[in-house]
């Protein structure tokens, strides 16, 4: 498992291409050859970029779901809707498919935000609004999620 670090602001051109920031590209370098999967996020109007190795781990888990249960089948269909494979080209650009640009409401300025083992791709205004909207709740959320005894030595 990888641990990506950083938040990067960049621009998307009219074709949906973004130049991957060099600091992020260095972190992703070991995974470049295998490519990436890009998809709609489940909880926000942003996109998620999975290194192929991380995607395969997730798919192995999803393959364990019983497809004869309607909820599982519905979840798989909706989770994988619009999923695309993408690569960083020789110029260091990543092409975001048009349908996903539309889903995320991406205009021109975007934010690439590390989320442990994936990268979230946000329209800059939506990202800032999301952080602003949830800032009051973050202390309570942090306590609820991380404030138990399950994490020995984590502070």
Curated annotation (Swiss-Prot):
Short name of any one Pfam family annotated for the protein: MraZ
HAMAP family: MraZ
Top-level taxon: Bacteria
Subunit structure: Forms oligomers.
Chief subcellular location: cytoplasm
S-S pairs: none
CDD domains named among the record's database cross-references: MraZ_C, MraZ_N
UniProt xrefs under InterPro entries: MraZ (IPR003444), MraZ_C (IPR035644), MraZ_dom (IPR020603), MraZ_N (IPR035642), MraZ_sf (IPR038619), SpoVT-AbrB_dom (IPR007159), SpoVT-AbrB_sf (IPR037914)
GO cellular component labels: cytoplasm; nucleoid
Keyword Cytoplasm recorded: yes
Keyword hit for Transcription regulation: yes
Family per record: Belongs to the MraZ family.
Keywords: Cytoplasm, DNA-binding, Repeat, Transcription, Transcription regulation
Localization per record: Cytoplasm, Nucleoid
Protein name: Transcriptional regulator MraZ
Domain SpoVT-AbrB: 7-54, 83-126
PANTHER family: TRANSCRIPTIONAL REGULATOR MRAZ
């Amino acid at each position: 498992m990888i641990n990506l670090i950083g938040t990067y602001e960049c621009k998307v051109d009219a074709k949906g291409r973004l130049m991957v920031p060099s600091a992020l590209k260095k972190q992703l370098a070991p995974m470049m050859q295998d490519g990436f999967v890009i998809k709609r996020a489940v909880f926000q109007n942003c996109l998620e970029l999975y290194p192929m190795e991380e995607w395969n781990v997730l798919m192995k888990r999803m393959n364990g779901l019983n497809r004869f249960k309607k909820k599982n089948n519905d979840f798989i269909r909706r989770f994988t809707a619009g999923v695309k494979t993408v690569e960083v080209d020789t110029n260091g650009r990543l092409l975001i498919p048009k349908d996903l640009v539309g889903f995320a409401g991406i205009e021109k300025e975007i934010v690439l935000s590390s989320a442990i083992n994936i990268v979230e791709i946000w329209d800059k205004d939506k990202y800032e609004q999301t952080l602003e909207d949830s800032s009051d709740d973050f202390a309570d959320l942090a306590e609820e999620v991380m404030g138990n005894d399950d994490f020995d030595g984590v502070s």
